Amino acid sequence: MEREGAQRKRREAMIPSSISPPLGANRIASVSHRALTLSALLLLPQAFAAEPLGSAGTAPARAPYAQRADVRAFAAEIAASTDIGQRDVERWLAGAKYQPRIVAAMDRPLLVPPKWFEYSPPLLSSDRVSAGVAFWRTNAYLLARAEALYGVPAEVVVAILGVETIYGRNTGRYRVIDALATLAFDYPRRAPFFRGELREYLLLAHEQRWSPLVPTGSFAGALGMPQFMPGSHRQYAVDFDGDGRIDLWHDSADVIGSVANYLARHDWLEGQPILLPARIAAESQDAALRRLDGGISERRPLAAWNADGVDAADVPADVAADPVGLLLLEEAPENGEARASYWIAFPNFYVITRYNKSRLYAATVFALAQAIKAARDAEPL
């Protein structure tokens, strides 16, 4: 652990102050420290991100946001705690429109959680792998620079962007101000969270000097190619090309640097594995599987797993001593028989779950990263 701590300190010393969190980041609500991306809010990434503008249907009659006492109180609170004027906040929120389809999307139940063999195939398609290779080829210098600075492999950054938005194809078409206002003021179940994100969004627009009425994003207010929520944008997004602004929609440098910074800031361990196939002794299988809860176990030292008849193939000699978990992935049935694969989940797997807490998401990022790297390595020089 001392080695990893020293490694992190050296890397932090390398990061220039120009990509530190913005002034006021310490005031960000605690929810901003979670995996605040669109796919962190839903199990299935991009389930509704491409809903078109103007598709909201007929909304019930309701007072415009500018006329509502709760909205005026929110504007006053923003003005009292930031350097944004109350009239500016009220003017911006006067331009926000309630979107009933957003509320419907948030309330849509996931009747049966998907299994690995149902969840992963669309996200591991040949089209997505090819798009990832092309993105890597185009941005090879930036990805190499980010890997050198943050210690995050290029294929992992590329895979996350592929899962989230297919490299910017599906960044969402709702106005962000509409999405966040709808969920902040007309979705009581998550109102505190989304009021915090609306606050972060207005601060972000103020700091970046763009109108909050223009950007579009997901139905949950996630932004750009990496689908950062506003709080994560303010805390983790970086101006990786040094042009004085951060653009997560169109600037590949900022996108790549921001994703790598996010993972590094959540304790990515350079050179360490994500997943390795697990081997479970026949006499230990029942006891090992009883440790699983929702397809993943608690974390224990690798030596403790080994003592219980569970080990991993090809463990690097310099593997970190951090605790690891046992992961189950449901494979497609054969002849009516359920099948599963088992994996040892190393600390970097859990770092990916800080981007999205789903074990299926993190496993898909790993699988897509492996597929993209293999395809990239197979290209002629």
Spell out what each predicted region is:
Residues 116-258, 264:
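Acidic/His-rich structured neighborhood in mature extracellular/periplasmic domains
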Residues 284-381:
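C-terminal soluble interaction/assembly domains
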Residues 212, 216-324:
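Flexible, glycine-rich surface segments
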Residues 17-37:
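Bacterial N-terminal signal peptides that target proteins for export
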Residues 51-147:
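An acidic, Gly/Ser/Thr/Pro-rich helix-cap/linker signature
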Residues 2-13:
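Extreme N-terminal basic, low-complexity initiation segments
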